[in-house]
Design a protein with these regions (language model features):
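N-terminal leader/linker segments that initiate helical-solenoid repeat arrays
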Residues: 17-54, 58
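Helix-turn-helix repeat elements of alpha-solenoid scaffolds
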Residues: 41-56, 88-97, 131-136
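Short coil turns that delineate tetratricopeptide repeat
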Residues: 63, 107-109, 150
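TPR alpha-solenoid repeat register
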Residues: 68, 112-114, 155, 189
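TPR/TPR-like (Sel1-like) alpha-helical repeat modules
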Residues: 96-100, 133-139, 169-187
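Terminal, low-structured helical/coil segments at or just beyond the last alpha-helical repeat
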Residues: 181-228
Length: 228
């Protein structure tokens, strides 16, 4: 009887442990979204630092879980925009290393978010010798994220953004449309809906650039015919 009770308590405590981790991660994601989308830019740096400290503590408590490590990397990377150049460069290198560590632990964690974030870092970071920016690695990571989560808002949006940055407009349009129609998570409606709005703006920009390119091509053809 005592043994059965002991086993039941162990199972219950491990379940509570998992739920506490999930709750903590959800709170971190909600707070990050609030800082990123709603906090005035001049106040974001201190808020990110405060949230980063909490996330680092959570990662220490759960060293075998990839999720807190991914969030530590995300916060470091987004806070880099509010730091001086030297500190920002150090931060994105640290974020990259954290994401690689998270992938080693569990590549499927957070529906492949480590690959999304790492891919985004690869195409936004400065190239060698200053940074580690690499278009080929970026696309590989973002495509891996899509294989893990083909219907995700973030996986489709950020691959679309990568394609847009490389002037691959037709492909970018397709992935922005997928991001817009992807289902939002009930527990993170605010963050997901804000990213959907960004996808709509990106799609509008993509179509505008396509139209400009078409007009430019038509003008070139017209001018060449006039010369003849």
């Amino acid at each position: 009887m005592k043994k059965t009770t002991f086993v039941a308590l162990l199972l219950l405590s491990s379940q509570c442990f998992a739920e506490n981790l999930d709750d903590s991660l959800q709170n971190i994601e909600s707070e990050w979204a609030s800082i990123y989308y709603s906090t005035p830019k001049q106040k974001r740096g201190p808020e990110y630092c405060r949230l980063l400290e909490r996330t680092i503590n959570l990662a220490r408590q759960h060293p075998k879980n990839a999720e807190p490590i991914i969030w530590e990397a995300i916060i470091k990377a987004t806070n880099a925009d509010h730091q001086d150049a030297v500190s920002a460069l150090k931060a994105i290198h640290e974020a990259r290393d954290l994401l690689l560590k998270a992938i080693e632990i569990n590549p499927q964690a957070m529906s492949g978010s480590a690959y999304v974030t790492l891919g985004t870092l690869y195409y936004m970071a400065p190239k060698w010798p200053i940074g580690f920016g690499d278009e080929t690695s970026a696309e590989k990571m973002l495509q891996t994220a899509l294989k893990i989560n083909p219907n995700g808002i973030d996986s489709n949006y950020f691959y679309g953004d990568f394609l847009l940055s490389n002037n691959r407009l037709n492909e970018a349009e397709k992935y922005f449309k997928r991001a817009i129609t992807a289902p939002a998570r009930t527990e993170q409606l605010y963050a997901d809906n804000r990213l959907k709005e960004e996808a709509k703006l990106a799609l509008k920009n993509t179509k505008k650039r396509k139209n400009s390119s078409s007009k430019g091509l038509f003008a070139s053809l017209f001018n060449s015919e006039s010369v003849k």
